[in-house]
């Protein structure tokens, strides 16, 4: 019987030089539009009070001055709760909530994705269903739980609910399903490794882009969170709440409010830049593996 020979042709996708230039120009324009609000916020924080209310408004400060930052620190230091206390509360909420959520979400995601046990699919469907509910809907239930554990009016009342967010669990589970191969885990189990060791030393490095993305998202959300229904004492309020009080001061506090906005914006940007570079580096190195 004669054999039919088939010839395989490689399909090479290529763009013209004009197409590359057009895409580059479009990305540059979009990047400039995304960067302009940050530049404007910094410019506003450096303007003296008379320039803040100048008409027509200027984009850049004509006579830049750091007095707004000085006024901000003086204002916060003369308040009943010092400036450092608001910053400390925000850092504790952001760091504690982020890393606690990362630990629990990745551990539960590993169990749902790579350990076979009865009810795993039902649990994951429950996680998927919970994504449809806004936090406002569950606020009363969360308040009752926090009250039962005597966590009302403490930082734990904000940190612990952040641990229970199901979005990070869903993200980590999906990444582990596609990027962590069962053959690698089975080899580790045959070598006598425990599940907790496999999760930490094998699974977590394989999904590094996922948990770095989770850190960025969770940290920014907690850092920018304002007043909470679980906290009513002034000494446990966050920095975002303090900014709201400064902004409510009106025209005379406009400069200090602009300076506070820059400080509030700076930390998430730094976290994003550091984590984003690690994400790109990790994805680039993982793409070179066989």
Can you say where each PLM-predicted feature lies in the sequence?
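A hydrophobic, multi-pass inner-membrane permease signature
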Residues: 2-290
């Amino acid at each position: 019987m004669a054999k039919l020979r088939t010839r395989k042709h490689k399909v090479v996708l290529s763009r013209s030089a004009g197409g590359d230039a057009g895409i580059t120009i479009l990305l540059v324009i979009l990047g400039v539009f995304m960067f302009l609000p940050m530049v404007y916020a910094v410019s506003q924080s450096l303007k003296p009070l008379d320039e803040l209310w100048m008409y027509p408004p200027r984009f850049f400060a004509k006579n830049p001055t750091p007095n707004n930052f000085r006024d901000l620190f003086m204002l916060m230091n003369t308040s009943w709760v010092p400036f450092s206390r608001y910053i400390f509360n925000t850092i504790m909420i952001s760091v504690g909530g982020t890393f606690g959520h990362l630990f629990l979400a990745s551990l539960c995601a590993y169990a749902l994705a790579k350990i076979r046990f009865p009810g795993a699919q039902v649990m994951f469907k429950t996680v998927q269903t919970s994504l449809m509910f806004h936090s406002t809907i569950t606020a009363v239930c969360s308040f009752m739980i926090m009250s039962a554990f005597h966590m009302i009016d403490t930082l734990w009342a904000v940190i612990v609910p952040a641990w229970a967010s199901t979005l990070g669990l869903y993200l980590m589970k999906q990444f582990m399903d596609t990027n962590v191969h069962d053959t690698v885990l089975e080899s580790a189990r045959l070598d006598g490794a425990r599940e907790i060791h496999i999760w930490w030393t094998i699974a977590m490095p394989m999904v590094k882009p996922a948990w770095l993305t989770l850190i960025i998202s969770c940290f920014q959300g907690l850092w920018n969170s304002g007043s909470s229904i679980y906290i009513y004492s002034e000494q446990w309020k966050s920095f975002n709440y303090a900014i709201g009080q400064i902004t409510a001061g009106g025209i005379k506090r406009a400069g200090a409010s602009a300076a506070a906005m820059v400080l509030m914006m700076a930390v998430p940007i730094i976290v994003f830049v550091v984590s984003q570079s690690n994400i790109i580096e990790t994805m680039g190195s993982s793409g070179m593996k066989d």
